[in-house]
């Protein structure tokens, strides 16, 4: 990996990607490539932090003046009580994957999954206002994507999942916090055909293809 952009001095921004286990994480490779393309004096390193060790880890980061943390599983939810504030999507769906620690020690968490997904959709020129969307899957990012869809004008969202109870939990939260109509259905061929017949946007957020 080309690290010519990293000066390895006191101005170098150190970003710690934390989780357990960390053997297969691809985030440092992706972020360090981006840092290089942007000529940023920054580097991301993977750090294995065991479940239950987050309080000590956060204190160590403050002591060592480490400003940026990228939590992955199982810390996306567990880190929230240790932060001073989080953004709306993180608060509603209890998932943070970017943390900034200011010089005074205050910590701020945001969730980027929903925003990233919406940026990808909008960059393709898709118009969302007044449209109906169909989402297949109800994993950890489904809710935050749904929240962003509502902010960008989606009128109705149907979530299909093999375990309909999981989809219903997300639908209930979205119906409580947004004006978008959201319903959950079991993932059957009949329900898929019916929902697809009126949807203008399809989102595949199941684990299929992640391996």
Feature-to-residue mapping (PLM):
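Glycine-rich adenosine-cofactor-binding loop
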Residues: 19, 108-114, 126-154, 161-166
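Phosphate/diphosphate ligand-binding glycine-rich loop within oxidoreductases
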Residues: 2-124
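Short, conserved SAM-binding/catalytic segment
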Residues: 170-181
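Residues at the starts of beta-strands that form the adenosine-phosphate
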Residues: 14, 43, 132, 155-156
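Rossmann-like adenosine-cofactor binding region
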Residues: 180-211
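Short glycine-rich anion-binding loops that position phosphate/pyrophosphate groups of nucleotides
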Residues: 73-78, 141, 207-210
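Receiver (REC) domain switch-region micro-motif
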Residues: 69, 133, 202-203
């Amino acid at each position: 990996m080309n690290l010519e952009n990293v000066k390895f001095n006191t101005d170098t921004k150190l970003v710690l990607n934390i989780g357990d286990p960390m053997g297969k994480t691809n985030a440092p490779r992706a972020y360090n490539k981006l840092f290089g393309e942007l000529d940023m004096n920054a580097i991301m390193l993977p750090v294995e932090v065991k479940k239950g060790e987050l309080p000590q880890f956060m204190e160590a980061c403050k002591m060592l003046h480490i400003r940026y943390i990228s939590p992955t599983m199982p810390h996306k939810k567990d880190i929230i009580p240790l932060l001073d504030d989080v953004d709306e999507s993180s608060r509603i769906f209890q998932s943070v994957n970017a943390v900034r620690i200011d010089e005074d020690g205050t910590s701020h968490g945001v969730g980027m999954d929903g925003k990233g997904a919406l940026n990808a959709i909008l960059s393709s020129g898709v118009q969302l206002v007044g449209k109906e969307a169909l989402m297949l899957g109800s994993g950890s990012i489904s809710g935050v994507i749904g929240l962003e869809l509502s902010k960008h004008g989606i009128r109705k969202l149907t979530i299909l999942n093999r375990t309909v109870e999981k989809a219903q939990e997300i639908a209930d939260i979205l119906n409580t916090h947004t004006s978008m109509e959201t319903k959950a259905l079991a993932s059957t061929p009949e329900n898929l055909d019916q929902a697809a017949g009126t949807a203008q946007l399809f989102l595949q957020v199941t684990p299929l293809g992640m391996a």
